[in-house]
């Protein structure tokens, strides 16, 4: 049995920032971070190097120290308009205070900290005139490469300041045998042991949804299901969205579709980026990245178009629904993401290798040519097609025949357990980050870590 003052389960953005702030407040506190993935410097993904996904037991993209954000495009939203509901929990002033603290901490660990991209009124007007809503937010874009270096500096600082980080350590159970402490059952390299902790911070991210559900069952914590987002990753020539990316870097646009009046969103824009694959609990889904290094830029841009689904009673398995849609894409794609030309989709035919080889937009991901209409439900597919045509009005060329759609891209949001104002679900047990059902991005996950550290 090992003993610690504070155990942090999950070494992603929320967990690392909680540890950083705890150390600044309590120089002598014993703190342990465990993560089921590898240390950042040891996280290697064949798919990220242009090879096929080999279905690693623990995905190096979505799991490991520094979290799934380590290999993201690393866009830090300096605001509360999207990326989570932290302002609803804390009030906008308090939430912004912690988000600004995150920005300052990142600057301290970053080399050549990037400029802030600010909102643009002309682009907002252009979207409004075409029945679209451009979300207003300042953005700090580190890029996948610069973010990895920044996170490694933060990790090194924590280790140098006597915070123990244990990788390849999976928490398989959490209990509270007495009121004074918790006991975590941990498996590390097939060796099982227990850690006793006065306080526990659960920061397992979206990939830890099953663990959060297990905790709710163990401690009889009430929770509510969140929405899920299902859609595609879209790739086209970078010049089509250059007006937007030059002025605000990342356009986040909401669309109300005509047929069903559903809300879709365009987000996770990557200028000069690449489309990537990631393994979410054995399901291969699409994502996107871009780099700060100009030598790594491509002639393409990519972004997600997702349709939000809010289920009502009696259905209470939104995550399982989204996973099954993505699993169907893998079945058709022979274990891989599928890609289709927009022109082929509109004409009701699958994309084959010949048509893909003649395409003017060269795919940046080695995906299987196929037919997305065989995967996505009619309502979601209709929403996506209508959104592409709507976006074409503000960025002509978006609806070109050669635009590529990769399927599927899905965002699963964890259960939202009932908690107090300190994000405490029972005394001494805190849930933060995307695994809490509150944050949906890097900035708010990190801000939650800082906030909870102030409550301990």
Where are these regions (language model features)?
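Dinucleotide-binding Rossmann-like beta1-alpha1 core, especially the glycine-rich loop
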Residues: 64-115
């Amino acid at each position: 049995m090992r003993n610690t003052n504070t155990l942090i389960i999950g070494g992603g953005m929320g967990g690392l920032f909680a540890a950083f702030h705890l150390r600044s407040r309590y120089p002598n506190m014993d703190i342990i971070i465990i993560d089921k993935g590898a240390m950042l410097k040891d996280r290697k993904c064949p798919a990220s190097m242009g090879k096929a996904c080999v279905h690693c037991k623990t995905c190096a993209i979505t799991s490991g120290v520094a979290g799934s954000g380590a290999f993201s495009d690393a866009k830090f939203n300096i605001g509360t308009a999207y990326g989570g509901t932290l302002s609803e929990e804390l009030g906008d002033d308090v939430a912004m205070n912690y988000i600004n603290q995150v920005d300052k901490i990142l600057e301290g660990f970053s080399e050549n900290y990037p400029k802030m991209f600010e909102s643009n009124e002309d682009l907002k007007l252009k979207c409004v005139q075409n029945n679209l809503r451009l979300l207003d937010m300042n953005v700090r874009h580190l890029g996948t490469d610069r973010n990895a270096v920044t996170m490694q500096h933060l990790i090194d600082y924590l280790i140098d300041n006597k915070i123990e980080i244990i990788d390849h350590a999976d928490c398989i159970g959490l209990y509270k045998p007495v009121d004074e402490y918790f006991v975590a059952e941990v498996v590390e390299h097939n060796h099982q042991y227990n850690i006793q902790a006065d306080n526990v911070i659960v920061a397992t991210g979206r990939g830890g949804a099953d663990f959060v559900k297990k905790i709710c069952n163990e401690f009889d914590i009430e929770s509510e299901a969140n929405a899920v987002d299902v859609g595609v990753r879209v790739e086209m020539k970078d010049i089509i969205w250059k007006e937007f990316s030059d002025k605000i870097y990342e356009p986040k646009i909401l669309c109300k579709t005509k047929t069903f009046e559903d809300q879709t969103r365009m987000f996770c824009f990557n200028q000069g980026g690449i489309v990537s694959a990631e393994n979410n609990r054995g399901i291969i889904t699409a994502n996107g990245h871009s780099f700060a290094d100009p030598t790594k830029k491509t002639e393409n841009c990519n972004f997600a178009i997702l349709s939000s689904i809010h289920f009502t009673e009696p259905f209470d398995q939104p995550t399982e629904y989204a996973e099954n849609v993505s699993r169907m894409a893998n079945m058709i794609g022979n274990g891989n993401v599928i890609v289709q030309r927009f022109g082929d989709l509109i004409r009701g035919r699958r994309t084959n290798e010949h048509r893909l080889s003649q395409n003017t937009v060269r795919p940046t991901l080695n995906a299987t040519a196929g037919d997305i209409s065989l995967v996505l439900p009619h309502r979601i597919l209709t929403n996506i097609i209508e959104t592409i045509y709507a976006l074409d009005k503000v960025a002509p060329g978006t609806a070109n025949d050669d635009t590529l759609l990769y399927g599927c891209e899905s965002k699963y949001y964890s259960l939202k357990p009932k908690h107090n104002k300190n994000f405490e679900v029972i005394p001494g047990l805190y849930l933060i980050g995307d695994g809490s059902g509150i944050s949906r991005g890097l900035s708010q996950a990190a801000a939650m870590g800082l906030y909870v550290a102030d409550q301990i």
